[in-house]
């Protein structure tokens, strides 16, 4: 059973609501704890140059990486391998500079599974992110690693994902992120946290590079060529960039379980 003591001021601030789920929710409890912090309280808006998402825009998808730029969705920001993400046309994408990501930013998923945070590294840099990713570009008040570490902590996550009255919200807006309180930690503590975050980010980049190099070594040793979209069976709608796969099967090879082409593909059978 969870219990807590609250003041009349808190009850008044919540419209005189006495129901326990409001006052005992993790988000409200985190904000209450922030009030007892020995350091000055700022907000994410105070310690950021900008907090925003790119909004919606028209996208033209392409297959050739030379003609496009990688677009990341809310789930992709957590992936280590971004080579298989969708590519959109450079020519037909306006205001690319405003949509491009920079190293050191905190990226937040604001739709779907909300509140997931990523510390942008070299893999994210200069790629684009959709309207489902909020960017936090820190200023010089707090170090960038500290801002990320706080937002990804249980306190930051609770305040990101819960509304004013403790309910779980379905979508995060930049204004929600800006209003989150964050302590103005001492410089020595900031340096310690930021150094650890920067080291972790560098190690992640090195690990990704090592994995990519290992993949190349394996392909060369096994004499495997790089796969293209044509190497995968495609049975979707007509697409100028993809050839529809086709093959012949004898009637006796098709049972009553399914006549879906994908299930009878030669690649699946092998």
Language model feature labels by segment:
Residues 1-57, 186-270:
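Non-catalytic DNA-recognition/assembly elements of restriction-modification systems
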Residues 41-60, 75-103, 270:
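Sequence-specific dsDNA recognition surfaces
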Residues 61-69, 78, 84-87, 99-101, ...:
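Short, surface-exposed loop/turn microsegments at beta-strand edges and helix-strand junctions
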Residues 77, 94-95, 107-117, 148-162:
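Well-ordered mid-protein domain cores that form the structural environment of catalytic cofactors
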Residues 95-96, 123, 167:
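A structural connector/turn signal
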Residues 100, 110, 150-152, 159, ...:
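Intrinsically disordered, low-complexity, charge-biased terminal/linker regions in eukaryotic proteins
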Residues 109-149:
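A short beta-sheet element
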Residues 126-134, 166-188:
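A short glycine-rich beta-alpha junction/loop motif
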């Amino acid at each position: 059973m969870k219990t807590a003591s609250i003041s009349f001021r808190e009850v008044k601030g919540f419209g005189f609501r006495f129901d326990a789920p409001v006052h005992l929710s993790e988000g409200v409890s985190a904000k209450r704890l922030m009030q007892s912090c020995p350091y000055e309280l700022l907000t994410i808006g105070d310690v950021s140059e900008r907090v925003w998402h790119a909004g919606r825009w028209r996208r033209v998808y392409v297959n050739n990486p030379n003609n496009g730029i990688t677009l990341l969705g809310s789930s992709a920001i957590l992936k280590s391998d971004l080579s298989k993400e969708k590519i959109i046309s450079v020519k037909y994408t306006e205001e690319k500079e405003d949509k491009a990501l920079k190293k050191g930013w905190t990226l937040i998923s604001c739709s779907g599974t909300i509140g997931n945070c990523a510390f942008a590294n070299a893999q994210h840099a200069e790629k684009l992110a959709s309207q489902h990713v909020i960017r936090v570009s820190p200023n010089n008040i707090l170090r960038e690693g500290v801002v990320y570490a706080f937002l990804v902590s249980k306190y930051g996550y609770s305040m990101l994902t819960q509304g004013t009255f403790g309910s779980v919200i379905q979508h995060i807006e930049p204004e929600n992120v800006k209003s989150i309180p964050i302590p103005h930690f001492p410089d020595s503590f900031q340096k310690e946290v930021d150094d650890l975050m920067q080291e972790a980010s560098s190690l992640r980049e090195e690990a990704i590079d090592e994995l990519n190099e290992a993949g190349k070594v394996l392909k060369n040793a096994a004499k495997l060529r790089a796969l293209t979209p044509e190497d995968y069976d495609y049975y979707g709608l007509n697409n100028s960039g993809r050839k529809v796969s086709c093959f012949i099967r004898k009637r006796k090879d098709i049972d009553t379980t399914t006549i879906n082409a994908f299930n009878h593909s030669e690649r699946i059978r092998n």
